[in-house]
């Protein structure tokens, strides 16, 4: 899967997971637009009669009556928009992925800020990074600083893929509380390894997403054909 196609999948995922709830009308607004009725014999205004005793006009209450809609103001909106319907296969495929892949894609491309996604991403990535470290002994303070970097690496890769500003080494050194020299000697190589973990996660998750979507669409098509037979 080349870079151009990966970007296409990202764009489809952004649209598929966008919050389009504001595009629909509320219940009261819809009711107001469709509340005009033609009652035929009965007038819209309540009838008024003269009270022979007091000489005053009295407004009578009409009983409930059935009616037919005369016209509708505005336009009706479907329960599911065309965009939501056409991108449903992408959402279905995302939800079928493994937890860390699903968490990464939703956090990266749907702007989901759910704490569970962030925890899943960092725990998985830290496990992968520890595997890369192997059995090498690392000082306790260094290990704690590396744990802080794993989440910063996730944010950095997300920003990089979106074309936004990424961290400078001097900025990272300040964030973890080390000198520029210490950063260069101890953390630069490991930082690059962390970012590679997330970049690989992104490409593999997107690839699996397209394969899962294709399989699901093929399965649904076969089911529909079987029903017709």
Swiss-Prot record:
One of its GO terms (biological process) is DNA-templated transcription termination. Pfam families: Phage_antiter_Q (PF06323). InterPro entries: Phage_82_GpQ (IPR010455). Residues 14-32 bind DNA. It comes from the Viruses. Disulfide bonds: none annotated. Keywords: DNA-binding, Transcription, Transcription regulation, Transcription termination. Positively regulates expression of the phage late gene operons. Bacterial host RNA polymerase modified by antitermination proteins transcribes through termination sites that otherwise prevent expression of the regulated genes. This is Antitermination protein Q. It comes from Enterobacteria phage 82 (Bacteriophage 82).
């Amino acid at each position: 899967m080349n870079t151009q196609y990966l970007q296409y999948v990202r764009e489809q995922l952004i649209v598929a997971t966008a919050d389009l709830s504001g595009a629909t009308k509320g219940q009261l607004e819809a009711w107001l637009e469709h509340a005009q009725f033609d009652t035929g014999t009965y007038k819209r205004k309540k009838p008024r009669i003269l009270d022979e005793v007091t000489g005053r006009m009295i407004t009578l209450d009409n009983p409930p009556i059935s009616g037919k809609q005369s016209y509708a103001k505005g336009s009706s909106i479907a329960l599911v928009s065309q965009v939501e319907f056409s991108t449903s296969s992408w959402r279905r495929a995302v939800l079928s992925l493994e937890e860390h892949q699903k968490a990464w894609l939703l956090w990266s491309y749907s702007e989901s800020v759910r704490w569970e996604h962030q925890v899943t991403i960092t725990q998985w990535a830290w496990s992968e990074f520890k595997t890369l470290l192997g059995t090498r002994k690392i000082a306790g303070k260094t290990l704690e600083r590396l744990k802080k970097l794993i989440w910063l690496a996730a944010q950095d890769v997300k920003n990089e893929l979106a074309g936004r500003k990424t961290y400078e080494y001097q900025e990272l050194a300040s964030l973890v509380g080390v000198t520029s020299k210490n950063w260069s000697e101890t953390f630069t190589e490991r930082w690059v390894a962390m970012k590679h973990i997330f970049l690989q996660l992104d490409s593999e998750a997107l690839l699996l997403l397209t394969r899962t979507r294709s399989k699901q669409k093929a399965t649904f098509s076969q089911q529909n054909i079987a029903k017709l037979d």
